[in-house]
């Protein structure tokens, strides 16, 4: 109570902060007469002038007022649009690395030009991040006119660009791209073998459009680059056949987590079924020998019970295509991980694609935290303000609207079941349709949108259905959703980023209707006609009440509901919004309290009758807050676990960069060889032990295997007081001499290139294996809680130990290959590094399978002078193909290179 009184008297902290920016807005306005008097050439010359001022020691804040005034005037001349004062406030907020919450239609795209231009003046690159390729292209084209006017270059990253095109786009002053393209390019860059092959340049400043969608909704879904493993189609099909016969009373399903647990009777039934199918080793399902088949069982249960066709995925052209739970869009090319996608393929009887092993991975949380400065824009961020600050250290600032909002938000209506609810929705839509009022209906799934479509067909209402099946036309359909009598059904927030303008979108109509009309009088007349028609139609729509937004059920997040409401009432237009709910809605069914069900079911609510209740609305809000809190906890957990991997990832990637930048890595190789010798001697001759306790034969064998040399160990033991340190020093000297002899027999330049190639390949190989090990650890570490231990602390401790073991394995691996391989090299000019294969990219929830740390030692200390990396098999590392040719090695024997693979799958491929 007292808080609300104080807020009324003094305003909120947000109001006070926005008011404090008025001084800067006035400074910007003071420069307007000056820039308005400049010619086009003089206005463009402001850019080199500002850059000179920065070179002389001025800061971006120093030149902000004049720079913003310059952009405002250039926008008037190049785009025909002038920034409002509230948009100037938004630009200042973005420049300061904060989130500007701006309502739909307030011109976020134009606001971004202010901060983008100012920060691009430093020449370090500015990334503007969008949610889809269409918006990246659109904004780069439309705003590119302004930037080019001011002498800045603009690039856009979209799929199917080659590496040279990507590099050129990243080197532009301003780069538009989707979050996925940026993340995957970063991962691919860190799998390459030469600095010149990389496309990214150092991180500087990013502005994220629809920041809540990218940094909140997709925060649980890591970007993954993976490569294929062995085919297990038969196992998936066999397990799926058994799962389809399991009765519902033999398992318990948790719809919140999408996990399935077999009952005791269920375990016994599955054991018998698996035994009959020849899938069980022994008689106990949970014996260690059955770990793999239990994993397949879990995924098959999840696929058959929890994942619904046309809700979680669709079958298109014989393939399983994931549906984005937030937008309803098809996620072509994305696959669930850990065998879930294969389990769904087996369920639907389509071709089962091989599983993939993770080669590189990163979450958006850790990707975007690499930027020294990051800002964001959205229409809905206030409800997630604590999370933005906790994880990204970004404040949310609500920017005032240029014109007061006139939209009317009506109270929710509750019905007993879906059919009653949809009947009422269809009736309201028909009334508004007959009145000419445009209607936008938001649904949560393809299934619901098609069900409502059937209702509207019976009512005789013409309408457009916008869902994952037809997302190619998404922007065009949404853009015209404000036309007279238009009825549009959209899954969730499809079409986000495209304004719904009352009367229709002039630019889209020009594009559609005048596509084939060349420049000239006829086209000019057509444009004038369209503008007049849109203006006339807008007046009719305004008279009909503006855009009517209907929600068919509440989303898990209040923010998503607010996004739907926000499509109506843009720039002071009238409008209304209303949500229809029923007991069968997912939110009420899964998360609603039992008392809600009891009171509703026991009420005398007749079929088709609706009720409105503050108690029910409060219960819905409570359920939403509960889900929001759960999802936030999941995202925080993702950050905690990924931070452990992220620390290790940064070390590995820094090591790769140092290796690629170095002209020679001989010192690194020598340090690794010496460390390997120390480890071998340390294992055989533990500190504090007596010579009688040393494992002499093991030491001989290990030296022979890893270093390829024989040592006079028996003679050394005849000496008095021989110490492990002395043995280490002597073995190092022998190994160094052996390596020096090998180096003198080959071309020096080619040898240096080979050393770098082997370092990178071994580093990449072991890093890939390490990722798989960490993933397996993460899946089971939660069980430590039963032993009264904290899972995250256990994970940190074990992950660090695994990382140290990986580094030891890399040192030994590189040493073995260089010391024991018989290598024939051509001169360096003929030496070609291997090309990066085309790996599969995916973006999958690590907890549900849905689409949706202790600091390490400094990098240079890991391997000595420089750091190491990981790589796959040595294909391409040896220009002459197989260095072991002619040695009579069996094709099924382990490859002498030490990769752990069979010879026929490694160097034997070349033979």
From Swiss-Prot:
Record's catalysed reaction(s): ATP + H2O + cellular proteinSide 1 = ADP + phosphate + cellular proteinSide 2
Gene3D superfamilies in the cross-refs: 3.10.450.50, Helical scaffold and wing domains of SecA, P-loop containing nucleotide triphosphate hydrolases, SecA, preprotein cross-linking domain
Mode of membrane association: Peripheral membrane protein
Cofactor notes: May bind 1 zinc ion per subunit.
Biological process per Gene Ontology, one example term: protein transport by the Sec complex
NCBIfam families with a match to the protein in the record: PRK12904.1, secA
Protein name: Protein translocase subunit SecA
Lineage: Bacteria, Pseudomonadati, Pseudomonadota, Alphaproteobacteria, Sphingomonadales
